[in-house]
Every structure is written in structure tokens, then in C-alpha cells.
Amino acid sequence: VNLTIILAVLSVGLWSGLLLSIIAPVTAFFFTGSPIMAAIPLMFPAVMAGNAVLAITVWYFQKKTSFKWRLPAGLIAGSILKAIFMGVVIVLIILPIFGDNIALKLPKPEALPVVLATAKVTFSITQLTTALIGSALAYVIWMPLKKYLKVEN
């Protein structure tokens, strides 16, 4: 998802990346049926906003700065800011307030502490890792792709 959002921003523009930021969590939910997302609908806008942070940061560094390594810097900054945003909003605010709702969606409600611990890692450390991996892949794909897109225009 991160790779797709980044490539959309770089090749089509900010609005396409923002659109994907909104669509991706909903689409993912339809395929995975996450009990956490089902139990706490407030997670959807939080994930959407985290994706948007990545898109806006990459766009800002690419379009509004002029130093040599602006794209790698934007990719790294966007990944870090996304993880921080999601860590604060989801891990420190949403899960402590609404975490008990998850037990209602679990086949074994007694598994709630393990599910919450996993969710805290998923929405912080894992977000950073996947955003950095997506950023690295986007960079590798973007370098030859941008030359092709310039030729086509």
C-alpha cells in the first residue's frame, strides 16, 4: 500500500495519493475482516490519516524543496511521520479508550491482552517497517519510471 501511495503521488500527483490513502484501509478491511477495525471504526480515519501523512510528506519534499536528496529524505521522513502519527493516535489514544470493544469481536475474548499487544506493535513499529520497505521499493521503481514518464509527456 505504501509503495502504491508513493508512486501515485510521484507520477500522478498528491490528490491520487490522498485518494489511495482513503480507499486502501476500507479495501483491506473487506479482504481481511480485521476484528480490530470492526470493533473500533474510528481506526479507519486514523489509518487513512496516517497514509495521508506519508503522501503529503513525500509530495512536499519532492515539490517544495530543492536539495539534492529530497526524494530519499521525503520518503524517510514520511515513513517516520506516518509511524509516529499512527503510534500516537492509535496506540496511545484509540486503543486505550476503545480497546475493550475488540473483545466483543473475538472468538475468544480472553485473548484481548495479546490482541492489544499485537495491535500496538502493528500500528507503530510494523507501520514504520512497511513504510520504509515501500519507500525503498518506490525509489527503485521511480528512478527509471520518471525517465520514461518524461519521454511520454
What are the functions of these language-model segments?
Residues V1-N153:
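Loop-helix junctions at membrane interfaces
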